[in-house]
C-alpha cells in the first residue's frame, strides 16, 4: 500500500514503516560517526524506548557503547491494512540494525506502570543479561493505572493558583491564537504527580534492586524538561511542575540507594523538541518554531539524538558532568543560553498570522512533526508501495 500523512490536530493518524526505519538509521549513523562512548554502559534497560528521547538513549547505548539493550514500550502492532504506531516501526528497525552488528536487543510491549511488565522485564534480564548497569526512564503518558490501588490517574496541563492566557499556534489553521487555561484543582495536581512524578521510576528501581538485577555501580536517569521564563507558567509553576518537583525529591532517595553500591541516580534535563506530547501543549508549537529559528541561525540546533548522545558522552559517562545546583544533569544549556532566550522573548509578541513563516521556523516545526511518524525523511520514496505488516524480532508480549 501507499501511505501518505493524514494529520488530525496534534496527531498524525498514519505512519510510514520505511520512513521510520530510515529515521532510525539516520540516528544510528550520527552516533556511530562520533566514535565509541568511552567507559559507556554494557547492559541497558530503557523504559519508554520506542520514540523520542527514549529511542535516542537506546540508540546511543547500543551503537555508541556497544551495549545490549532491553526496551520497554507500549505500542500498537500493525493489523492487516492498518499501519502500526511509529514506535512499533522504530523498534523493529532498531532490532534489525542491532542484529546486523551482533548486538543483543529484546523488547517488551506493555504497560510500564504495571507490576506484570516489571516482572516480565526482571525475568528477561535474569534469563538473558544477568544484570543491567544503566536504567533509563523516559515514559510520557497521559494516564496511569496505579498497580497497587487500581485507580487510574490523569495528568493535567494547567497553571496553579490563577488562570493563564497563553499565545500559541493553531496548527490546523496556521494562525496565532490565545488559550485561557483555568487553574488546576488539588485533585488534578495530585493526579498529574501520580502520572508524571517519580513514584513509578522509584517502583522500577526498587523492583529491579530487590530482584538482584542491578549491577554494582549501576546508574539510572529519568528525562525531564524544565525550560525558561517563556514556558515557566505552564511547566515549572503549573501542575506538571509539581510532578517535576516530585521527580527531584524521588531521585535523592534513589541516589542514596544506588550510591551504597557505587552507583548513581540523576534527573537529566533535555531541551525542548517536537514530540507527540509537546505538540499537544498550547504554547509549545510557537515556542519551538521560534527556538528553531534562533538556534538554527546560531548553528546550535539539536534534536533528540544529538541531545542524548551528548548527555551520554559529556555527563552520564563523561567527567566532569554538567550538573546544576540541584544535582540534575543539564543537556539543555544551548537552549537556555541567555542570548537565545532573549531573542525568543523579543519575537514572541511580534508573531502574527501574516508573518508566522517569516519570524519563526514553523515550516521546520511541521517537518519535524511529520518526521515523528516516518514522513519527510530524506531518501524515502513515499510514492512506493510498502508493507505495513512488520514484526519486531525478539519481542516479549
Curated annotation (Swiss-Prot):
Looking at the UniProt record, the site noted as Plays an important role in discriminating NADH against NADPH sits at: 75
GO molecular-function annotation terms?
enoyl-[acyl-carrier-protein] reductase (NADH) activity; NAD binding; trans-2-enoyl-CoA reductase (NADH) activity
The reaction(s) this protein catalyses: a 2,3-saturated acyl-[ACP] + NAD(+) = a (2E)-enoyl-[ACP] + NADH + H(+)
Organism superkingdom: Bacteria
Q: In which pathway does it act?
A: Lipid metabolism; fatty acid biosynthesis
Q: What EC number(s) are associated with this protein in UniProt?
A: 1.3.1.9
The active site annotation covers 235 (proton donor)
Which UniProt keyword terms apply here? Fatty acid biosynthesis, Fatty acid metabolism, Lipid biosynthesis, Lipid metabolism, NAD, Oxidoreductase
InterPro entries xref list: Eno_Rdtase_FAD-bd_dom, Enoyl-CoA_Rdtase_cat_dom, FabV-like_NADH_b, Trans-2-enoyl-CoA_reductase
A Gene Ontology biological process annotation?
A: fatty acid biosynthetic process
Q: Which proteins does it associate with, and in what oligomeric form? A: Monomer.
* Job of this protein: Involved in the final reduction of the elongation cycle of fatty acid synthesis (FAS II). Catalyzes the reduction of a carbon-carbon double bond in an enoyl moiety that is covalently linked to an acyl carrier protein (ACP).
The identity of this protein, by name, is: Enoyl-[acyl-carrier-protein] reductase [NADH]
Gene name, Swiss-Prot/TrEMBL: fabV
